[in-house]
UniProtKB/Swiss-Prot annotation:
Organism whose genome encodes this protein: Cyriopagopus hainanus (Chinese bird spider)
Protein's UniProt name: U4-theraphotoxin-Hhn1q
Signal peptide: 1-22
GO molecular function, a single term: toxin activity
Pfam family, one: Toxin_20
UniProt entry keywords in alphabetical sequence: Disulfide bond, Neurotoxin, Postsynaptic neurotoxin, Secreted, Signal, Toxin
Domain of life: Eukaryota
Disulfide linkage: 52-66, 56-77, 71-82
Length: 85
């Protein structure tokens, strides 16, 4: 009787662990598909950095101050670079 009970509990524990692992694997694969690839994120960051560095290089013309372009995405232009605020 005890052996049967232990066998049933062991099988149940293995089944629960297997199901949990399968769900985690499925969730990870869905996250990888939905997200933006790293290369696209890097291109967006490089574009923002370029825009900011170009706009920060604008100098005064006569008595008028040139307005710098603002960085997008919650970033500010500091030291000729877009930095997160």
């Amino acid at each position: 009787m005890k052996v049967t009970l232990i066998a049933i509990l062991t099988c149940a524990a293995v089944l629960v662990l297997h199901t949990t692992a399968a769900e985690e694997l499925e969730a990870e694969s869905q996250l990888m598909e939905v997200g933006m690839p790293d290369t696209e994120l890097a291109a967006v960051d490089e574009e923002r950095l370029f825009e900011c560095s170009v706009s920060c290089e604008i100098e005064k013309e006569g008595n008028k101050d040139c307005k710098k372009k603002k960085c997008r995405g919650g970033r500010k232009c500091k030291f000729n670079m877009c930095v997160k605020v």
